[in-house]
Amino acid sequence: MKIVVSRGLDLSLKGAPKESGFCGKVDPTYVSVDLRPFAPLPLEVKVTPGDQVTAGSPLAEYKLFSGVFITSPVDGEVVEIRRGNKRALLEIVIKKKPGISQTKFSYDLQSLTQKDLLEVFKKEGLFALFKQRPFDIPALPTQSPRDVFINLADNRPFTPSVEKHLSLFSSKEDGYYIFVVGVQAIAKLFGLKPHIISTDRLTLPTQDLVSIAHLHTIDGPFPSGSPSTHIHHIARIRNERDVVFTISFQEVLSIGHLFLKGFVLGQQIVALAGSALPPSQRKYLITAKGASFFDLLPKDIFSSDEITLISGDPLTGRLCKKEENPCLGMRDHTITLLPNPKTRESFSFLRLGWNKLTVTRTYLSGFFKRKRVFMDMDTNMHGEKRPIIDAEIYERVSAIPVPVALIIKALETQNFEEACRLGLLEVAPEDFALPTFIDPSKTEMFSIVKESLLRYAKENVVTSS
């Protein structure tokens, strides 16, 4: 199936790493296992500081669904269990042993029954890789998904491409074969053909995939790479019982690697990007999952209050300004550094704004059609919060036809029934990143949706499963 998306906005941000900018491998001293994505679920920590762990060792377990573990990606020693407000679990920090783990697993995918395969996924931390829609929560083992969507079309700013992720392996063919094994495992686990969404420029091993998966291509501006866009165009979610799972290309590689090679895939590709990072430092690295920023970035960056650190892309990533030793998030493959200006631009309201981004034609740049928007992004808000007046501008950049402003108003009044009727079942917080970015009213839509979905999932979805 060929999908063409017309709505959205391609952001060409300054600070992207060069496509040829690989700079070897970095073996970090510390890594963390990010537990923030599991906030809707109560977790039981299985380790204490001082414990020795190996790659694949259980670190935490779903309290309500025993036997589902979150596992360590590396060998090492647990040094800290970080908690936030109300003792909420944030991450488990591990002092990594040098080198790659040699812990061997032996699973024969062909001989495993579906029930046995589910137990392997739960035990080895593979089930924790899936996300569940509606409500964008960690996948629950009590649910049988109607569909599974595998995303190979992620086009968030600075995010490494599929080709970059294949650089982990000896050859592109080897990487794709591992991916095929991962797809086979998913198809067998759920008894269905998953949907694989890629772009036209990717050359997939279609002869190996066509019999076990539905293949689709998508073309269009950001956010055409969002799973919500794929689900909307291929098989819409129409009610809360329409459960679908989503998973990324990198996570499918982790699944295939365990079954084919017998080892936990503890490494990942990371893009160092952002206009606050010197051009010579903008590059791609091969490092351990959850690596500490201190091992990847120049040391002088951490003492500057004019730089904002983000784990992930600049639109949906996690702000790390209050963290003493920030580490990569669970699903993050980018470290973004943005300028944090301390002064305002003089007479900014009188300037023509030829190089400023505007969707409402506030600046001169809005009157000229340009295929791509080039901008030097920083953390300046360019104004204070104000009431929402023009609700139509959000629909111009939203890839799926939902009334953005009405959903936000329903969520702010905690009217979840109305929000679901308007389209909340189809969306995730990331779908509101671009409307938040271009919003003249400065409303933190991304945070509102994220917190609302978390609250609703805790009270209604998780406890009833």
Swiss-Prot record:
InterPro entries xref list: NqrA, NQRA_2nd, NqrA_C_domain, NQRA_N
UniProt record, GO biological process: sodium ion transport
UniProt keyword annotation of Glycoprotein present: no
Broad class of enzyme this protein falls into: translocase
UniProt keyword terms in alphabetical order: Ion transport, NAD, Sodium, Sodium transport, Translocase, Transport, Ubiquinone
Protein origin, superkingdom: Bacteria
Swiss-Prot/TrEMBL catalytic activity: a ubiquinone + n Na(+)(in) + NADH + H(+) = a ubiquinol + n Na(+)(out) + NAD(+)
UniProt xrefs under Pfam families: NQRA_2nd, NQRA_N, NQRA_SLBB
Transmembrane regions: none
The keyword Membrane is assigned to this record: no
EC numbers, comma separated: 7.2.1.1
Molecular function in Gene Ontology: oxidoreductase activity, acting on NAD(P)H, quinone or similar compound as acceptor
Quaternary structure (record): Composed of six subunits; NqrA, NqrB, NqrC, NqrD, NqrE and NqrF.
Physiological role: NQR complex catalyzes the reduction of ubiquinone-1 to ubiquinol by two successive reactions, coupled with the transport of Na(+) ions from the cytoplasm to the periplasm. NqrA to NqrE are probably involved in the second step, the conversion of ubisemiquinone to ubiquinol.
Family: Belongs to the NqrA family.
PANTHER family: NA(+)-TRANSLOCATING NADH-QUINONE REDUCTASE SUBUNIT A
Name of the protein in question: Na(+)-translocating NADH-quinone reductase subunit A
Gene: nqrA
